[in-house]
A protein has these predicted regions:
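Short glycine-enriched nucleophile-adjacent loop
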Residues: 49-61
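Substrate-access "cap/lid" subdomains that shape
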Residues: 28, 62, 71-176, 202-224
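Mobile gating loops/cap/lid regions near enzyme active sites that modulate substrate access
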Residues: 213-333
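Alpha/beta-hydrolase active-site loop
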Residues: 13-31, 88
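Active-site loop->helix "elbow" adjoining a glycine-rich segment at hydrolase catalytic centers
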Residues: 14, 46-49
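Alpha/beta-hydrolase-fold catalytic nucleophile elbow
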Residues: 43, 58, 69-72, 155-157, ...
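Alpha/beta-hydrolase fold nucleophile elbow
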Residues: 34-45
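Single conserved hydrophobic/aromatic residue that forms the stacking wall/gate
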Residues: 1-12
Length: 333
């Protein structure tokens, strides 16, 4: 990309550079395809949403896009990866071979790479790296300082983001010991006293920390920076025994956004109606910068005073986010 051509060869967000290159291409050529370079909307889910979170904070993406749909992302804010840690892991990986030179590493088989990677990177989450170049500082600090793009944002997450990833061993107190302070642990346990199912309780906590709290934080900071923001919570659970087990899991909203329902879970009239409603919000936001459109339930802009959220379920309605109190206690940012 033009904006990174002078970068030294170091630990940078190469994936982010690819995204910036694509956005530069859109600015230069989209008009030839009937597009509008002054009305570019990004949409991403999970890791894709993480990329959007960094593009919003990157000085390299200035004026390359104007709106963003951020679905079920946020771990980059709660679990930043330092460039020094990445260098240590890279050196450990290279030194696992007799000859760690670049020339030799290029000739290593895929099987050898996978075998060593499983050991070296066993506990490593491949998140975006805080490199001090593509983003000037720690990501959350960039948002708090206002060093972000002035764009509009539609952001949210699902009710049961972590339900697919439990292995049957749920130890809430141990997790709280690792993730928060003793004082916050007591408050969180008191807040969740009425929830009897330990898996649901754990899911609620992890969903809040990794998805909800970062989303509310981003919505507030972009609004404070002059952008308009809307927050949603996807709660729809299919009418099926398997669906009831996992709830509104990570990625469950995607078939509704893109109308790509398949046979893995049953799809009925309620799902089709919700699909049309979600698509109308998303498309209206991309076209006009406002998700509200004729016939749809009104979606108010986000206000931190009440954590205003649009719930997408069998019925669509507005309320304060159910995890806002968890986020206030966690106080992550």
């Amino acid at each position: 990309p033009r904006s990174v051509s002078s970068a030294a060869s170091d630990v940078y967000k190469r994936q982010l550079f690819d995204q910036i290159l694509a956005l530069e291409w859109i600015q230069e050529y989209v008009a030839y395809f009937g597009g509008d370079a002054s009305n570019v909307t990004l949409i991403g889910e999970s890791a894709g949403a993480g990329g959007i979170g960094h593009l919003i904070a990157s000085p390299l993406s200035k004026d390359l896009f104007h709106k963003a749909v951020h679905q079920s992302g946020g771990s980059s804010l709660t679990y930043p990866t330092s460039s020094s840690n990445v260098r240590k892991l890279a050196n450990s990986f290279a030194n696992s071979f007799n000859d760690p030179s670049i020339k030799n590493l290029k000739n290593i088989s895929a099987e050898e790479v996978l075998e060593v990677s499983e050991e070296v990177y066993a506990e490593h989450y491949f998140n975006y790296v805080d490199d001090g170049f593509s983003v000037n500082r720690n990501l959350s600090d960039s948002y708090k300082s206002g060093n972000i793009q002035n764009v509009d944002l539609l952001i949210g997450s699902n009710n049961d983001e972590w339900s697919l990833y439990f292995d049957g061993n749920v130890n809430i107190r141990l997790w709280l010991d690792q993730e928060t302070t003793p004082e916050k642990k007591i408050k969180l346990l008191e807040l969740l006293t009425d929830i009897e199912d330990p898996v649901r309780k754990m899911d609620l906590l992890i969903t809040a920390k990794n998805f909800v709290c970062p989303s509310l934080f981003m919505a507030e900071e972009l609004k404070r920076n002059g952008g308009k923001t809307w927050v949603y919570q996807f709660n729809r659970v299919r009418d099926d025994e398997l669906a009831q087990k996992y709830g509104a899991f990570h990625g469950a909203e995607l078939p509704y956004v893109f109308d790509t329902h398949d046979q893995w879970l049953p799809t009925n009239k309620a799902d089709k109606v919700l699909t049309e409603e979600i698509q109308s919000y998303w498309l209206s936001f991309a076209k006009t910068g406002d998700p509200n459109n004729d016939g749809a339930v009104v979606w108010p802009e986000y206000e931190s005073s009440n954590d205003s959220t649009l719930v997408l379920d069998n019925e669509i309605y507005q309320r304060s986010h159910e995890s806002s109190e968890i986020c206030k206690i966690m106080d992550l940012f």
